[in-house]
Amino acid sequence: MPLTLLQDWCRGEHLNTRRCMLILGIPEDCGEDEFEETLQEACRHLGRYRVIGRMFRREENAQAILLELAQDIDYALLPREIPGKGGPWEVIVKPRNSDGEFLNRLNRFLEEERRTVSDMNRVLGSDTNCSAPRVTISPEFWTWAQTLGAAVQPLLEQMLYRELRVFSGNTISIPGALAFDAWLEHTTEMLQMWQVPEGEKRRRLMECLRGPALQVVSGLRASNASITVEECLAALQQVFGPVESHKIAQVKLCKAYQEAGEKVSSFVLRLEPLLQRAVENNVVSRRNVNQTRLKRVLSGATLPDKLRDKLKLMKQRRKPPGFLALVKLLREEEEWEATLGPDRESLEGLEVAPRPPARITGVGAVPLPASGNSFDARPSQGYRRRRGRGQHRRGGVARAGSRGSRKRKRHTFCYSCGEDGHIRVQCINPSNLLLVKQKKQAAVESGNGNWAWDKSHPKSKAK
């Protein structure tokens, strides 16, 4: 078919079919000047164009030429035929509408005329005695129309007469009936698909209702005969839908906690619908959604210490992650925990230290004796030394029994509340600046012990 030829030709030349047109029926003896003059006269409203190629079609005993326009085809200005040498030249372009759009238009037309595909076939088949139209129907088109009618008729019948699913509103389920949320979603989708009058939609809606739901809609129709289907669905939503008030949405969000055996990422997925309902009921503002989500995860889920500290830091800096970023972070942490498994502590504590240094004497270097299988704990070469007067590493050899003297225990306290055992980033207690000031003063007065005194008061070298 010519349309197939156009599509194949454009595909072979890597062209956009929306900018190409195929001209058929050009006589073989048509000169180049005559062809250009005819083409310019016919395509002057379509803008600039160029000839891609030409070929000879044996079945028509004529030439076919492919043109490419500089812009998309304007179907309102496109001629169906071009008057030229040897008769009109046929113009073939890609249809404006796809097959699905064509079926929708055909469906709406048949509904407006109250006809079916069988009626269309009957009218076309019986209308043989009428006067010949200006453009005769070719046998190929007639065969295509019959094939299309036979293929489209079951689809149209299914679209026109597809019944809605049953909904009753009873607490005792009826066979074939759905829950309200699923039924409402299905019904709304079908109403958008139907191209029928409002009265027909209302009749089909009444056919699928049973019990209390039917009584509600019947009462509404008795008080208002012109009620729309959307108003009926809104009334059913108020009667049978879930009750989501401001207070209920707030309580549901606050009472959401991680269940036993539930992953944190699964808890976040379960928390998200509750958070969105809270936003819809104005419990949470949209600009604070991420902060509220992070707050609920910190208070309602069991998190590893490192992950909790990281999320707390995000919360304090007012830079909470979004929903997808938070789920990705939690899943990566869960995958890491699952990969390490029970050997996590042993793998994290495994560290290969460099060889212990030798004691420098006047004679030479004497290696230190090794005690058991332990290594001397020295930082690696890439370790960044802490800055501070009393934190420089001293040279020499560790004394016997002072194996842990290199890594001294430091007295840490929070610079926010003044309590021991945590730092300011991890603090959740109220601020106590007076206690912090007292502990800072005590630390300054005590100094760093004998080690700091030796560093600040070095002994004079013997000459």
Swiss-Prot record:
GO terms under biological process: positive regulation of apoptotic process
ZnF endpoints (CCHC-type): 412-429
Record keywords: Metal-binding, Nucleus, Tumor antigen, Zinc, Zinc-finger
Compositionally biased region (Basic residues): 383-396
Pfam families associated with the record: PNMA (PF14893), PNMA_N (PF20846)
Keyword Nucleus: yes
InterPro entries associated with the record: PNMA, PNMA_C, PNMA_N, Znf_CCHC, Znf_CCHC_sf
Coiled coil: none
Any one GO molecular function term: nucleic acid binding
GO cellular component assignments: nucleolus
Localization (cell): Nucleus, Nucleolus
Keyword Cell cycle: no
Tissue expression as described in the entry: Expressed at high levels in the brain and testis. Expressed at lower levels in the heart, trachea and kidney.
Region feature Disordered, mapped onto this chain: 363-410, 440-463
Cited PANTHER family: PARANEOPLASTIC ANTIGEN, PARANEOPLASTIC ANTIGEN MA3
Family from the record: Belongs to the PNMA family.
Protein name, per record: Paraneoplastic antigen Ma3
